[in-house]
Amino acid sequence: MNDIAHNLAQVRDKISGAAARCGRAPEEVTLLAVSKTKPASAIEEAIAAGQRAFGENYVQEGVEKINHFQQAGVSGLQWHFIGPLQSNKSRLVAEHFDWCHTVDRLPLYRSPLKVLIQINISDEQSKSGIPLEALDGLAAEIAELPHLELRGLMAIPAPESEYVRQFAVARQMAVAFARLKTRYPTVDTLSLGMSDDMEAAIAAGSTMVRIGTAIFGARDYSK
């Protein structure tokens, strides 16, 4: 078993354990492998180990990888854009990716896309997203657009070392997610939790965790 396959197995075991501890089935939580800055060869190893959903932060890099695997005839992959959504790159995201996790305003593009509304749950100026109180308005606007499929919410909470505080923030997201589900039948995804807060996020109700370094190793931003 290579390193990436081994790492994936360990992460999946952690997800299963976290789900079991709060009475949930592991199948309720999707693992999104964050492959930003990683070469196609690393993604190929993950695919060989059964991984199908990948997250990319940079539009051009992601598009190149998507094209690579399409040209190679690899099917069944899901590509999620999880980086800040710039207006001048939104068309490329809609044309190439299956999902966008970082919608925080009404998109201008017209290509079909599954979208998550990003919530700035910790009210950080350095992060994108809308405050929770703005959710109802943006969700209603997105629901009116037939080419967009509103699937749920995403958040990147401020780092917290204590589980209790991680869980408290995650519960705020889970409550908002549950309320959104009652209004829109397509809503089924709460993208919440990374390596350091995955267990609290799953306990609170996350349905998708975003894991990168624990699978692919440290990132090289120099390239």
Short names for language-model regions:
Residues 199-203, 211, 215-222:
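Expand to "…catalyze enediolate/carbanion chemistry for C-C bond making/breaking, isomerization
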